[in-house]
């Protein structure tokens, strides 16, 4: 096929000349139509042309002169320039739109002329603006357009601008297909334009997949090479002679014929439909439609399809049909010859295929068919089992299928077959399982409480796919469950219940069941729960619980197992008692609940228990220690070899357990001194089952006491202290064993201290302290300490000078108790000499000791201390003077001067008095010129002996030192004696000397001078020394006798005075009893000293007539001391410090406080009182007033007081007798003194308090003990003498250890009555012990000289004498020390311990 040449697309220039609104908006393959064409021009040259202005909304039109018409002349104007940019905005069939530009400034006044030239034809158009539409043109014709700008004069035109172009041809007419083939089409058309002879034609062929162009120079064209059955668009364009300017296209669309269909077949033959398919070789087959002619014996109809297949529906099932297919393009008019196919439709599927019967190896099937052609049908039954397929046939609508496998899935498909014997309808299928065979050997492999395990067998070949339904039936329920295997665990059953189990084999469809196999049984009862055993010795009580709903029908079997022995018991209720068992033996009790059948038992619930062992026997302690106890016991049980033993150790709420494998145990880790209850339980071999406990209660031994010390040792007591760290020590008592040689005594204490009394002084004791637990029986190990008591001081100590010897003779009575010797200490100032005495006789015998030589006439303090094993007694002191002896011989001779013819003066210094005071001097005259050596024998010679020539040496004058007048001494202390005066002194005459004789003088000095009855000096019995003889003095001649006589008289007077003075001096020395010098001038003026052995008769005498004698004595004492001054007490500032106006302290003995800020601050109502051995042994004071408490404590501190004796209650008979001056609990400050009560022991008759007293300024402190006697009424006396004597002993024992300068402070209310009685008792007891004499009167007198009203009442005075009487009587009864007989009071007090601040005083424990 020849293809015409294609025309070029629309020229680009043409497009640019067109206005924007009329440009082709697509490629020039479609219509290039022009818009705004106002008129389509004809081809006649006579048509009127018009010019339309396309800008400014103005339309200009004018008649145009015929071509060649001349223009009239105008005024000459400037020629416009040629227009620029002349172009076509639009080219149409009969019109053209032109545009141009003008750059002239006068262009606004321009008009424009457009010259239109076509060959020889010229037309003119005008325009006021720069564009113009030229209409009335001839289609497809060449035109030249020249535009001239014309000035405002309308005549002057510029150069013309030209453009040449063809108008578009007119579209072709009557375009049609003369022939349409499978791959080609013949087109024809017509054209009416006058210029058509010069036209060529472009045919544009467009399909969905391509665009082609071809050309033709005539008005027809054959288009070849097309695709069959394809829709094509054919568009024909007339093209002007320039081969560029095209007319608008004329179009026609059509299909090429399809290719014939091929390979027609039925893809699917259905019951009422057939699916046909075919092929077509044309490439445009997707655009085909197909007509299918459907023909059967009675009818014809057509179906169409847009694709190469179709489903023909609405057919009659099982009927013969002829199907013919025609391919038809989209226009449904072009067809080729059809292709035919003959076939039967399928019969309809059979309906309601059901099984009338399903058996183990056969199935009966039935079905229905509704087709009108069904009478000609036969039926094929396909029997499928897995991959095995068998076919059965039937001419009717039912069939029995036999020879099947049990329990197997079969699919039975029934096909209706048409009359051709081949075309079968869709199969109607039914799938089912044949029944499985019934299960075999159904049995219960396991019967549980809530479950049963069933097993069975199945011999079917399909049994692997079986499941099994187990129907479980009881009286109250029916349940089903399934199993995939030939066994099943049936759970959730009710214990102890009868169940029927039916097992059905179920085919794999889970529906088809075999006939059931049946078994019946009881589930096991639930094991009993909460099985408990009450242990007995030979029986066990069991009880249990069963929660099963069927438990009312249960019985119970109890299996009793002991080793290899098994017994069974039964019970109808959930409890039982098993008897006849062995003690302490392991039994396993297994309880089985038995269902109502009497055979089905639940699992046994077991409990293994031991019977209780019998209680242990003979529990006892083999040993009780501090932290351990050894227990033993016996057990008679036959199984006791396997027993262990639990020992429960109970201590209050604390319980611990110990174990033992044998019948004894050591329990350790106990607390000392603690009550424990030990309960021993025999425990069976299980380690848990215990028999009844056997108990024993006991205390562990307390620990041995620690730090046992003798804190305070006296003659008859030892204060023991110790510590106990035991937790239970608060409940302990303590036994103190006091051992001396073979004698052992005991005492008890409730605290960790004890004062052991009634000891023998100076004796070694072994003190063993045993802590005793609260049972008062269990003792700890004793802690021992050996301690010697302080030995007793010697009694009746006397110190005597030995005449004319320098040593002293000491005498004392051997003390009570033991001792190893005596230390004798002799000291004078800083000089001290110590000696020892080792021996003493029996108690009370006198010991005499001679000291080593001392200085003559020296006052020594001699102290005798009893020594015993390093301890010493309180020293007994005496102040003694050694004897006087001859005075030392003077170094110088006397100075002798002649006074007259018969007298001379002898001047000599005093002899040294170191060997005794000089008592007298004897002036001796020696008449021999040579050999002046006076001797004691010369003292016997007198002046008369000299005159009688019996001696050359004589005593001329004796001077009594005490009688020397002041005139007898010169101012330089020398003595001057005038010899020869003729006076007489004692038995010596101071006779005149012989004138003109020579004399020498010597002076004899006497420390002791004794005279004969004749007043002659006893030389051998006197202590005398002689001075060297003086130089010889010669007397002058005698001036007269008268002078000698005068001197003799004077000497005689002097002798008398000397003798009188000497006698007075001797008497005074004899009367003086106490060598101590009082601190005051008070001297005892009266006393009634009575020996102890005479006191009883004296007492009875004074006691007669209602104590008349004592009353007289007491009356005599009333005036004692009352005239002594009390100025300080009477000062106005001090009156408020006195409790009573009639009890004021004497100035001479009052206690003065130190550091007074004013003169009255030193005052306190208190006096120093003499004791037996010290003038300041006591301070007697009134009870403090509120305003004097600070002064009271200030006195205690300043006077170094360690002991206070309080003899009154604070309030008596509703009257305040004394302020409470001590704190109860907290420390309290009294001025600068801080007082803290350390301890308080309250006893029936007295209270003992210890205070710590501290000076806030110096921070020094010491302890003060207060002895508060509470059983002495004011102005009265205690009930018994023993009570006061014992109390005095208590105070004395303590205070004897105080510092030696520490007085005892005694007070009651006024500080006179009870206070005086107590001080007097102390002095009298010591006087009895030391002197074996009694002076009650003298003691009271002495006290009253120091403080008024001491021993205030007659009753108190009589009471003092009664005390003395009782003391003496007790001595006679061999109770040597009454003070040791306080069996009641001291037993109470013996555990009281001094406060912690007590240390040592003077080497003794305090």
UniProtKB/Swiss-Prot annotation:
Per the UniProt entry, the Enzyme Commission number(s) are 3.1.3.48
Signal peptide start and end residues: 1-24
**Glycosylation sites noted in the Swiss-Prot or TrEMBL record:** 36, 52, 97, 103, 118, 124, 186, 192, 243, 275, 281, 296, 302, 331-332, 364, 385, 391, 453, 459, 484, 500, 510, 547, 568, 630, 636, 651, 657, 719, 745, 750, 766, 776, 804, 828, 1010
Quote the subcellular location field of this record.
Answer: Cell membrane; Cell projection, Ruffle membrane; Cell junction
Q: Which residues form the active site?
A: 1308 (phosphocysteine intermediate)
Q: Which residues lie on this side of the membrane: Extracellular?
A: 25-1044
Q: What is its main location?
A: membrane
> Can you cite a GO biological process for this protein?
negative regulation of T cell receptor signaling pathway
Q: What class of enzyme is it?
A: hydrolase
Tissue expression, as annotated, is:
Found on the apical surfaces of retinal Mueller cells, renal tubule cells and intestinal brush border cells.
Q: Which reaction does it catalyse?
A: O-phospho-L-tyrosyl-[protein] + H2O = L-tyrosyl-[protein] + phosphate
Q: Please give the Pfam families that the UniProt record associates with this protein.
A: fn3, PTP_tm, Y_phosphatase
Q: Which UniProt keywords apply?
A: Cell junction, Cell membrane, Cell projection, Glycoprotein, Hydrolase, Membrane, Protein phosphatase, Repeat, Signal, Transmembrane, Transmembrane helix
Please list the residue ranges annotated as the Tyrosine-protein phosphatase domain: 1110-1367
The UniProt annotation puts the region (Disordered) at 39-72
Boundaries of every Fibronectin type-III domain copy: 82-170, 171-259, 260-343, 346-437, 438-523, 524-614, 615-703, 704-793, 794-888, 887-979
What is the protein's given name? Receptor-type tyrosine-protein phosphatase eta
Q: Which organism is it from?
A: Gallus gallus
């Amino acid at each position: 096929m020849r293809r015409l040449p294609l025309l070029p697309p629309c020229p680009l220039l043409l497009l640019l000349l067109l206005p924007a609104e009329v440009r082709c908006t697509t490629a020039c393959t479609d219509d290039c139509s022009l818009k705004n064409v106002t008129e389509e021009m004809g081809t006649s040259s006579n048509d009127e042309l018009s010019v339309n202005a396309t800008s400014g909304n103005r339309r200009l039109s004018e008649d145009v002169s015929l071509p060649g018409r001349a223009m009239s002349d105008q005024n000459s104007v400037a020629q416009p320039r040629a227009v620029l940019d002349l172009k076509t905005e639009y080219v149409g069939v009969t019109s053209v739109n032109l545009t141009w530009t003008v750059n002239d400034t006068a262009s606004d006044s321009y008009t424009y002329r457009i010259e239109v030239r076509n060959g020889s034809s010229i037309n003119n158009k005008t325009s006021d603006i720069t564009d113009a539409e030229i209409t009335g043109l001839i289609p497809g014709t060449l035109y030249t357009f020249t535009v001239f700008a014309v000035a405002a004069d309308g005549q002057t035109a510029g150069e013309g601008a030209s453009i040449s172009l063809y108008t578009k041809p007119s579209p072709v007419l009557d375009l049609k297909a003369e022939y349409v083939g499978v791959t080609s089409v013949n087109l024809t058309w017509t054209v009416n334009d006058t210029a058509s002879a010069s036209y060529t034609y472009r045919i544009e062929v467009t399909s969905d997949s391509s665009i082609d162009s071809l050309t033709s120079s005539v008005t027809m064209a054959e288009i070849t090479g097309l695709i069959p059955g394809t829709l094509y668009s054919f568009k024909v364009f007339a093209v002007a002679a320039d081969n560029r300017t095209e007319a608008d296209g004329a179009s026609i669309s059509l299909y090429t014929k399809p290719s014939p269909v091929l390979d027609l077949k039925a893809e699917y033959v259905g019951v009422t439909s057939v699916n046909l398919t075919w092929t077509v070789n044309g490439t445009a087959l997707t655009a085909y439609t197909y007509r299918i002619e459907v023909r059967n014996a009675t009818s014809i109809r057509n179906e169409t399809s847009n694709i190469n297949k179709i489903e023909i529906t609405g057919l009659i099932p099982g009927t013969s049909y002829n199907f013919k297919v025609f391919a038809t393009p989209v226009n449904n008019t072009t067809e080729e010859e059809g292709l035919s196919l003959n076939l039967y439709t399928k019969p309809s599927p059979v309906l309601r295929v059901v099984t009338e019967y399903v058996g183990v190896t056969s199935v009966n099937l039935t079905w229905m068919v509704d087709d009108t052609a069904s009478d000609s049908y036969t039926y094929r039954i396909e029997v499928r089992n897995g991959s095995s397929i068998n076919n059965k046939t039937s001419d009717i609508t039912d069939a029995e299928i036999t020879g099947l496998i049990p329990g197997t899935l079969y699919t039975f498909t029934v096909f209706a077959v048409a009359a051709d014997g081949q075309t079968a309808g869709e199969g109607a299928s039914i799938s089912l399982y044949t029944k499985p065979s019934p299960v075999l050997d159904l049995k219960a492999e396991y019967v549980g409480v809530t479950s049963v395990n069933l097993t069975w067998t199945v011999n079917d070949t399909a049994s692997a796919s079986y499941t099994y339904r187990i129907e479980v039936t009881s009286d109250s329920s029916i349940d089903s469950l399934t199993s995939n295997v030939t066994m099943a665990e049936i759970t959730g059953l009710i214990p102890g219940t009868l169940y029927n189990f039916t097992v059905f084999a179920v085919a794999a469809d889970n529906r088809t069941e075999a006939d059931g196999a049946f078994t019946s049984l009881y589930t096991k009862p639930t094991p009993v729960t909460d099985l408990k055993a009450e242990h007995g010795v030979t029986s066990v009580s069991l009880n249990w619980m069963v929660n099963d709903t069927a438990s009312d029908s249960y019985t119970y079997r109890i299996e009793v197992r002991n080793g290899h022995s098994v017994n069974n018991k039964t019970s109808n209720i959930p409890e039982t008692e098993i008897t006849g068992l062995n003690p302490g033996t392991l039994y396993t009790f297994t309880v089985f609940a038995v269902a109502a059948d009497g055979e089905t038992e639940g699992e046994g619930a077991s409990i293994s228990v031991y019977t209780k062992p019998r209680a242990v026997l003979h529990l006892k302690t083999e040993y009780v220690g501090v932290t351990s106890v050894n227990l033993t016991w016996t057990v008679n049980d036959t199984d006791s070899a396997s027993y262990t033993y639990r020992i429960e150790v109970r201590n209050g709420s604390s319980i611990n357990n110990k174990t033992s494998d044998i019948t004894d145990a050591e329990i350790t880790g106990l607390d000392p001194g603690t009550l424990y209850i030990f309960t021993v339980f025999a425990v069976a071999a299980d380690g848990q089952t215990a028999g009844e406990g056997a108990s024993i209660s006991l205390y562990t031994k307390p620990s041995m006491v620690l730090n046992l010390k003798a804190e305070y040792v006296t003659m008859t007591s030892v204060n023991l202290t110790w510590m106990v760290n035991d937790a239970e020590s608060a409940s302990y008592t303590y036994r103190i064993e006091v051992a001396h040689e073979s004698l052992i005594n005991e005492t008890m204490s409730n605290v960790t201290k004890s004062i052991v009394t009634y000891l023998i002084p100076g004796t070694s004791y072994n003190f063993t302290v045993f802590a005793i637990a609260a049972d008062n029986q269990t003792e700890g190990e004793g802690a021992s300490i050996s301690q010697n008591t302080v030995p007793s001081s010697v009694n009746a100590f006397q110190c005597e000078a030995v005449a004319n010897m320098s040593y002293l003779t000491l005498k004392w009575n051997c003390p009570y108790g033991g001792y190893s010797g005596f230390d004798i200490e002799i000291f004078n100032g800083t000089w001290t000499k110590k000696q020892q005495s080792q021996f003493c006789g029996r108690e009370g015998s006198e010991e005499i000791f001679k000291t080593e030589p001392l200085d003559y006439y020296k006052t020594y303090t001699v102290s005798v201390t009893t020594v015993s094993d390093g301890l010493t007694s309180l020293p007994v002191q005496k102040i003694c003077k050694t004897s006087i002896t001859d005075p030392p011989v003077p170094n110088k001779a006397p100075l002798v001067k002649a006074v007259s013819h018969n007298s001379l003066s002898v001047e000599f210094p005093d002899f040294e008095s170191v060997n005794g005071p000089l008592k007298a001097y004897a002036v001796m005259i020696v008449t021999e010129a040579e050999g002046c050596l006076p001797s004691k024998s010369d003292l016997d010679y007198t002046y008369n002996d000299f005159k009688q020539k019996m001696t050359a040496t004589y005593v001329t004058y004796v001077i009594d030192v005490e009688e020397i007048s002041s005139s007898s001494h010169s101012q330089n202390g020398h003595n001057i004696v005038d010899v020869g005066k003729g006076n007489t002194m004692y038995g010596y005459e101071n006779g005149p000397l012989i004138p003109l004789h020579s004399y020498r003088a010597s002076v004899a000095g006497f420390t002791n001078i004794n005279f004969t009855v004749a007043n002659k000096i006893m030389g051998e019995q006197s202590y005398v020394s002689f001075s060297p003889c003086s130089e010889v003095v010669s007397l002058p001649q005698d001036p007269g006798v008268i002078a000698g006589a005068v001197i003799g008289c004077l000497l005689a007077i002097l002798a008398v005075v000397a003798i009188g003075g000497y006698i007075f001096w001797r008497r005074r020395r004899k009367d003086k009893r106490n060598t101590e010098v009082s601190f005051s001038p008070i001297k005892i003026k009266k006393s009634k000293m009575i020996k102890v052995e005479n006191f009883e008769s004296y007492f009875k005498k004074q006691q007669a007539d209602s104590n008349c004698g004592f009353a007289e004595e007491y009356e005599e004492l009333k005036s004692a001391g009352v005239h002594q001054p009390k100025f300080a007490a009477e000062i106005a500032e001090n009156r408020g410090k006195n409790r009573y106006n009639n009890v004021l302290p004497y100035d001479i003995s009052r206690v003065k406080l130190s550091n007074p800020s004013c003169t009255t601050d030193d005052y306190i109502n208190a006096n120093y009182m003499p004791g037996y051995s010290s003038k300041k042994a006591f301070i007697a004071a009134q009870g403090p007033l509120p305003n004097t408490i600070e002064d009271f404590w200030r006195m205690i501190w300043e006077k170094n007081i360690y002991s206070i004796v309080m003899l009154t209650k604070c309030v008596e008979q509703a009257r305040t007798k004394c302020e409470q001056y001590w704190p109860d609990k907290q420390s309290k400050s009294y001025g600068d003194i801080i007082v803290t009560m350390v301890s308080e022991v309250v006893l029936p008759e007295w209270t003992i308090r210890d205070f710590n007293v501290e000076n806030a300024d110096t921070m020094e402190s010491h302890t003060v003990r207060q002895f508060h006697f509470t059983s002495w009424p004011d102005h009265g006396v205690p009930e018994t003498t023993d009570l006061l004597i014992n109390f005095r002993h208590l105070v004395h024992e303590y205070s004897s250890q105080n510092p030696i300068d520490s007085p005892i402070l005694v007070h009651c209310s006024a500080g006179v009555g009870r206070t005086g009685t107590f001080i007097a008792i102390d002095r009298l007891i010591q006087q009895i012990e030391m002197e074996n004499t009694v002076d009650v009167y003298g003691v009271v007198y002495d006290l009253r000289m120091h403080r008024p009203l001491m021993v205030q009442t007659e009753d108190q005075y009589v009471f003092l004498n009664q005390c003395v009487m009782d003391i003496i009587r007790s001595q006679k009864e061999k109770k040597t020390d009454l003070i040791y007989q306080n069996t009641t009071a001291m037993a109470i007090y013996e555990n009281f311990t001094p406060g912690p601040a007590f240390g040592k005083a003077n080497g003794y424990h305090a």
